[in-house]
């Protein structure tokens, strides 16, 4: 920004050196105001045949800094009782007053009292009175928008109006049809001035509503429908608090014609009024006179259509190509069974999530309906293999083999191995005692090479003889103790598997598996139930799948699956991130918390440590140039404009701002007008060196005006075709001793 301003200063200085020799007194002061065309059909406060009185105290005495339009003191109306300011001010429909000075083009064109209006731009040009030194505007028959807006013959007359008023010509105005003139309109001008405390005045005479605010304080209060009334304001008389010398203030002018019985206006001021034109070219405008919500409409519900920010387009240069479009981001659905999407015709919508049978690797199968919290529900395809499951790939389940189970048990060749879906790996003796004959033991030979030779029957005839005539428990084998003594021994029932309960009953040896319920499985190395997490996998990226061991009242152990929704923000210290988990779109997703600025002059940002929006004053930069002043306007945001300088003799000299250099600080100086106005003595001739040190009024970037030499200023104005003429050098209004009226001022023109 600073570099752009420096470059502009260099360019303007070269212009000044080429064309400037002296200052000339501006003959006009031109500003672009907004005219809001009105019609009694849309707003019956116009052409209303109520009383015609000058009515004070209709509007609030303090102008809202953000709205910058007058507001009624009351919305009450008592027509029958004929009381109250709104009655005497013929404000019979107070709720529509807000559309006197604000755009309402989107209101219904077919309905009565919809408040619809038609904003138009108008150049308000004040002419220098070289005798008084004031800038004046005077029209006895003032119709600035004849043939325009609602008065344009091409405007489509609402059918309801034709039905209600079949004999009244829309274009001749409904209140009387006295002429083709457009009597129903309101003018708004928001501007600024620097108060120099040198006798500045603001004088007005006209009919119907006139309200003028200085420093957002009501100083001219001529409300209601009335004949021409006068208000003369000496700024030095403004108190509570008084205006401060060399301070910049707002000047806001509001004027309405509401009845077809005359239209006159006369304005005279010595204020050095200036503007920061918006991209519509309107003095201190907010852009709404040429860009509204409908201007940038692209008929795509999936885009956010906005007018450009103030200052992003050169003054008066707005086109629809400057509109700003951004993509609508549809909010993430908390319902996992709905998927958000944007329809170009209808905007954000949702569609049901289609739960496909089988996920990407085909290892899961859908069951049941979609769960609003968890989304699509899937069963692990390989759950049927229970504790023999080793996972899934490409839809193929991997199952424990006998070889793998053999490894778990140490590859003992005396057993046959397999995997049981409930028990996991199990083994069976190859040399079963049930195959043994009487008085023999079936033993296993580990070192043989042929499986057919693995089992060998060993005779225990001697032991049988010792127990002859004795009853031996079926779970025991005969044995000998002392000579001739029968001493049975227990059968070997241990299968060396810690995950089985070995038992012999009535001679039958059993190996009952240790029961581990749910998602638990017995660890063959420890004999304890341990978790088996794969069983709990629900194929949902938004859940944490865990298996926990729970002891039942009977002492048994069960594994319980848990599919807790994942907290995406658990490891994020930035609380400005808004997290959600979309099971149908990759899992955790975050968006930054958006803090809306509460006003144009406050910037709101999210504080990462708290997640709260924190407001701070907006900083407005003017590049450090002495001849530029920046401020934040509650309605417009950051604006940058030229510094106004008071001259030593306002009638004979112009106040000129000189930017600082490396060796000299910026300052204001006085330069004689050339030619000098009548009555001014010849003074020092301004040098090229002085001119080269200043800046002229010009638009830079965000509607910036740079001040300086008058010739350079005139050169810029000639090329711009339209401008704020004389903003830097209006001569002082010369007061008389009788109530502030200039003796040479022609009062007959009022």
Swiss-Prot record:
Residue ranges crossing the lipid bilayer per the database entry: 689-709
Entry's localization field: Membrane
Region feature (Disordered): 727-750
Signal peptide as annotated in the record: 1-22
Composition skew (Polar residues), residue ranges: 738-750
Domain PA14: 140-286
Keyword Nucleotide-binding among UniProt keywords: no
Record's GO cellular component terms: extracellular region; membrane
Side Cytoplasmic, residues: 710-750
Membrane topology: Single-pass type I membrane protein
Sugar attachment sites: 129, 447, 506, 554, 571, 659
Keywords associated with the record: Glycoprotein, Membrane, Signal, Transmembrane, Transmembrane helix
Extracellular topological domain residue ranges: 23-688
Keyword flag Glycoprotein: yes
Entry's family note: Belongs to the prespore-cell-inducing factor family.
Protein name as annotated: Protein psiO
Taxonomic path: Eukaryota, Amoebozoa, Evosea, Eumycetozoa, Dictyostelia
Gene name of the encoded protein: psiO
């Amino acid at each position: 920004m600073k570099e752009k301003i420096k470059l502009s200063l260099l360019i303007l200085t070269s212009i000044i050196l080429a064309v400037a020799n002296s200052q000339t007194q501006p003959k006009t002061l031109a500003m672009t105001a907004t005219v809001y065309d009105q019609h009694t059909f849309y707003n019956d406060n116009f052409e209303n045949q109520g009383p015609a009185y000058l009515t004070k105290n209709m509007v609030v005495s303090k102008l809202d800094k953000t709205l910058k339009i007058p507001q009624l003191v009351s919305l009450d109306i008592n027509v029958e009782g004929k009381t109250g300011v709104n009655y005497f001010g013929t404000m019979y429909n107070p709720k529509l007053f807000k559309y006197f000075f604000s755009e309402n083009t989107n209101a219904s064109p077919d309905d009565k009292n919809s408040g619809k209006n038609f904003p138009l731009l108008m150049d308000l040009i004040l002419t220098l009175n070289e005798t008084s030194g004031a800038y004046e505007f005077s029209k006895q028959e003032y119709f600035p928008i004849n043939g325009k807006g609602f008065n344009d013959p091409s405007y489509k007359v609402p059918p309801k109006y034709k039905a209600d008023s079949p004999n009244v010509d829309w274009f001749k105005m409904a209140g009387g049809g006295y002429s083709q003139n457009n009597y129903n309109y309101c003018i708004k001008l928001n501007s600024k001035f620097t108060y120099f405390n040198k006798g500045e005045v603001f004088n007005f005479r006209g009919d119907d509503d006139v309200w003028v605010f200085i420093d957002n304080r009501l100083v001219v209060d001529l409300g209601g429908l009335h004949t021409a009334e006068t208000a003369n304001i000496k700024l030095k008389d403004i108190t509570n608090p008084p205006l401060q010398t060399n301070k910049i203030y707002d000047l806001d002018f509001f004027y309405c014609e509401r009845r077809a019985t005359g239209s006159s206006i006369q304005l005279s001021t010595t204020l050095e009024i200036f503007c920061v034109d918006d991209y519509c070219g309107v003095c201190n405008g907010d852009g709404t006179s040429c860009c509204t919500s409908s201007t940038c409409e692209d008929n795509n519900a999936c885009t956010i259509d906005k007018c450009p920010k103030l200052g992003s387009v050169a003054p008066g240069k707005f086109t629809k190509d400057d509109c700003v479009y951004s993509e609508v981001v549809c909010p993430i659905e908390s319902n996992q069974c709905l998927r958000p999407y944007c329809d170009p015709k209808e905007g954000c919508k949702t569609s049901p999530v289609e739960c496909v049978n089988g996920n990407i690797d085909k290892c899961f199968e859908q069951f049941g309906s979609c769960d609003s919290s968890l989304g699509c529900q899937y069963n692990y395809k390989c759950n049927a293999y229970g504790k023999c499951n080793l996972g899934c790939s490409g839809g193929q389940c991997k199952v424990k083999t006998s070889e793998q189970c053999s490894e778990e048990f140490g590859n003992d060749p005396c057993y046959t191995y397999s995997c049981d879906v409930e028990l996991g790996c199990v083994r069976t003796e190859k040399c079963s005692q049930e195959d043994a004959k009487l008085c023999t033991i079936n033993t296993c030979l580990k070192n043989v090479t042929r499986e057919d030779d693995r089992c060998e029957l060993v005779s225990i005839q001697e032991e049988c003889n010792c127990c002859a005539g004795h009853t031996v428990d079926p779970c025991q084998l005969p044995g000998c103790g002392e000579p001739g003594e029968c001493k049975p021994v227990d059968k070997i029932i241990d299968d060396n598997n810690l995950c089985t309960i070995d038992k012999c009953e009535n001679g039958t040896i059993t190996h009952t598996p240790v029961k581990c319920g749910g998602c638990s499985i017995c660890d063959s190395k420890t004999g304890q139930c341990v978790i088996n997490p794969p069983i709990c996998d629900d194929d949902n990226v938004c859940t944490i799948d865990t298996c926990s061991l729970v002891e039942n009242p009977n002492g048994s152990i069960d594994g319980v699956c848990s599919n807790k929704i994942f907290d995406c923000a658990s490891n994020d210290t930035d609380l400005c991130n808004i997290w959600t988990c979309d099971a149908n779109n990759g899992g955790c997703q975050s968006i930054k918390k958006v803090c809306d600025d509460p006003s144009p002059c406050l910037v709101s940002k999210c504080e990462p440590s708290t997640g709260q929006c924190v407001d701070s004053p907006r900083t407005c930069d003017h590049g450090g140039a002495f001849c530029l002043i920046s401020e934040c306007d509650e309605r417009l945001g950051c604006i940058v404009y030229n510094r106004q300088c008071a001259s030593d003799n306002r009638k004979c000299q112009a106040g000129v701002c000189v930017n600082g250099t490396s060796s000299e600080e910026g300052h204001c100086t006085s330069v004689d007008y050339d030619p000098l106005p009548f009555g001014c003595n010849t003074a020092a001739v301004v040098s090229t060196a002085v001119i080269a040190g200043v800046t002229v009024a010009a638009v830079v970037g965000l509607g910036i005006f740079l001040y300086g030499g008058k010739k350079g200023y005139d050169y810029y104005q000639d090329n711009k075709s339209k401008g704020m003429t004389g903003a830097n050098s209006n001569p002082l209004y010369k007061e008389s001793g009788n109530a502030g009226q200039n003796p040479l001022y022609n009062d007959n023109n009022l």
